[in-house]
Amino acid sequence: MRALLDTSVLIGAESPGTLEGAISAASLAELHFGVLVVLDPDERARRTQRLGVIEATFDPLPIDAAVAREWGRLAAAIADRGGQPRRRAMDLAIAATANVAGVPLVTHDEADFRLIEDLVQLRTP
């Protein structure tokens, strides 16, 4: 594994089944939520199909004790820097997963990680 893919990359990819890298279980949670809250039936069908491809392609990295510890460290850093970590809970779980795995986080949303950009290795796709 060379990188962890953020949810934004999974959503933005034309063919998510061709992406290379790993994903966090937190990304699957975000994708499942996205399927369940959309009201338009056509969009729900598109999201469900994309989620199926992603689940068939990737074996997500878990949020285990090591990731929980790293999440705490990153959340504390955000709080110390004047941010609100609870608003970014899923992003922090994904960043913590990347840090524990020792790989960069590939994201379209670098601004989401601005307060901890010195603590997480970020890349754009």
Predicted regions and their residues:
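PIN-domain endoribonuclease scaffold, especially VapC-family toxins
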Residues: 2-3, 13-100, 114-124
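C-terminal structural segments of small proteins and small subunits
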Residues: 100-112
